[in-house]
Amino acid sequence: MQAALEVTARYCGRELEQYGQCVAAKPESWQRDCHYLKMSIAQCTSSHPIIRQIRQACAQPFEAFEECLRQNEAAVGNCAEHMRRFLQCAEQVQPPRSPATVEAQPLPAS
């Protein structure tokens, strides 16, 4: 969970910040009053191109991390290495290049 939260904070930080402020401001009713902000985080994480790439490229280390957490519920610190591997993988994923940023290559002379 912590690894996923770190990735979410990196790429959907604005949404996460707004949700956190709402929860802090409405301690009695945050579940109801801040639900739409929670949904905006979900929308960001499901649609952000880099997060989609991370989910694909780093599925194996993330699954290993989740499995470690299940096996070590009472001692999640035992999973620090698994989390480090996932975050290391996530950091290596490059954002997709949009067609506008790809430089045109000259055609070879014939």
Curated annotation (Swiss-Prot):
Locus of motif Cx9C motif 1: 12-22
Residues where N-acetylmethionine is found: 1
Keywords associated with the record: Acetylation, Disulfide bond, Mitochondrion
GO CC annotation terms, alphabetical: mitochondrial intermembrane space; mitochondrion
Predominant cellular place of this UniProt entry's protein: mitochondrion
Gene3D superfamilies per UniProt: 1.10.287.2900
Subcellular location: Mitochondrion intermembrane space
Record motif Cx9C motif 4, residues: 79-89
CHCH domain sequence ranges: 9-52, 55-97
Self-association state and partner proteins as the record states: Monomer.
Protein name: Coiled-coil-helix-coiled-coil-helix domain-containing protein 5
